[in-house]
Amino acid sequence: MAKSHLLQWLLLLPTLCCPGAAITSASSLECAQGPQFWCQSLEHAVQCRALGHCLQEVWGHAGANDLCQECEDIVHLLTKMTKEDAFQEAIRKFLEQECDILPLKLLVPRCRQVLDVYLPLVIDYFQSQINPKAICNHVGLCPRGQAKPEQNPGMPDAVPNPLLDKLVLPVLPGALLARPGPHTQDFSEQQLPIPLPFCWLCRTLIKRVQAVIPKGVLAVAVSQVCHVVPLVVGGICQCLAERYTVLLLDALLGRVVPQLVCGLVLRCSTEDAMGPALPAVEPLIEEWPLQDTECHFCKSVINQAWNTSEQAMPQAMHQACLRFWLDRQKCEQFVEQHMPQLLALVPRSQDAHITCQALGVCEAPASPLQCFQTPHL
């Protein structure tokens, strides 16, 4: 497993059990420096017996940028998961089943052929080019422009910010550059009566994968590594892991993966790769479970308010409640209760789900600092 600041908490076990066993330990002189030294790292806090102070007085008031490293570590962990044979085989079998149920049976063998040719390339390119720093920049957990010490200053991010608007990635492998374009001309039209809509096919398959990936289950799986960490540290680790993982999966699956796969591999345009959601694939908001009602309200209200002026936002938010026949009153109450926060968040928002996470009404609050601020700490 890759070295991880999040996972280094496991290395604190010898320190917690018997301080003399630690490879490096803080001296009494260093600990005498006070909070400035204690709270530089979790290791220092434990060695100086100041963990409670740092949790309550320093880390609990830290900015999201202080957690940048943990964010990057979880991206590394998720990327590592894609290298597992079982994971790749599960994705392949699922996509093969999706090919088999295509309504036009003439597309089935071609769909299978696309999987055979492109899936290994996509997985390999994803593993080698995804940049944790760029991903964490995208979700707002790392300051932009901050390079890792081992990163060459001239090296571009693998997933830079312009990816939000158009596909901009490093030089492609020759195998990918040699592949056909959106209509895959090497699959001759003479073999089929119609041109093959491979960008549509790509977009459909990607969204099908997104719909079935259990993000909550993955988040809990990532957090399992925290269970061997004792006492309060384990609770913080698990909380951070679960919240970060869902946030990162939202960012990766929602924007990065569709553009990476369909834009790079099939050279679909940005519009093709990120086109309108397919009704048969994208889950409808009305199908969400009852426990997500407030999250449902929030996303609908934000989507309604996006295309209005700041002056018209309150009215637009109330109008969004008209679609909820049975829960209109609850929706109105939600809008009234959260109106000040919504008016502040919506103008700066690019993603309704992330914004509602920041508001605390959708799963995985956008600020993992809540892990530090919970009452039991």
Swiss-Prot record:
Protein name in the entry: Pulmonary surfactant-associated protein B
InterPro entries in the cross-refs: SAP_A (IPR003119), SapB_1 (IPR007856), SapB_2 (IPR008138), Saposin (IPR008373), Saposin-like (IPR011001), SaposinB_dom (IPR008139), Sphingo_Act-Surfact_Prot (IPR051428)
GO (cellular component) term, any one: cytoplasm
Residue ranges constituting the Saposin B-type domain according to the UniProt record: 64-146, 195-272, 291-366
A GO biological-process term: respiratory gaseous exchange by respiratory system
Glycosylation sites: 307
Disulfide bond sites: 68-142, 71-136, 99-111, 199-268, 202-262, 226-237, 295-362, 298-356, 321-331
Prosegment location in residue numbers: 23-191, 271-377
Other comment: Pulmonary surfactant consists of 90% lipid and 10% protein. There are 4 surfactant-associated proteins: 2 collagenous, carbohydrate-binding glycoproteins (SP-A and SP-D) and 2 small hydrophobic proteins (SP-B and SP-C).
Coarse class of the protein's main subcellular location: secreted
Species name: Mus musculus (Mouse)
Function: Pulmonary surfactant-associated proteins promote alveolar stability by lowering the surface tension at the air-liquid interface in the peripheral air spaces. SP-B increases the collapse pressure of palmitic acid to nearly 70 millinewtons per meter.
SMART domains: SAPA, SapB
SUPFAM superfamilies xrefs: Saposin
Quaternary structure (record): Homodimer; disulfide-linked.
Domain (Saposin A-type) ranges: 24-64
Keywords, sorted A to Z: Disulfide bond, Gaseous exchange, Glycoprotein, Repeat, Secreted, Signal, Surface film
Subcellular location(s) of the protein: Secreted, Extracellular space, Surface film
Range of residues in the leader sequence: 1-22
